From Swiss-Prot:
Residues 10-16 form a propeptide. SMART domains: KU. The record marks R30, R31 as: Reactive bond for trypsin. This is PI-stichotoxin-Hcr2k. Its main location: other.
Length: 72
């Protein structure tokens, strides 16, 4: 996954900022995986359907993971 920890928190903050600011990408495949992404306009984790390939890091399997990483 994309959840990294460090004692200083430096790497976590850099990755968190990059992932959470990425746009929602459903991907180019046609599968249907329920996922969550952080919507930077609303400040909330929002459900979407992921196609299975070609997405980005703003793609979480659970609402809990999205909230934990993006602090929503």
């Amino acid at each position: 996954g994309f959840y990294f920890r460090s004692i200083q928190g430096f790497y976590f903050k850099r990755i968190q900022g990059n992932i959470c600011s990425e746009p929602k990408k459903v991907g180019r495949c046609r599968r249907s995986f329920p996922r969550f992404y952080f919507d930077s306009e609303t400040g909330k984790c929002t459900p979407f359907i992921y196609g299975g390939c070609g997405g980005n890091g703003n793609n979480f399997e659970t609402l809990h993971a999205c909230r934990a990483i993006c602090r929503a």
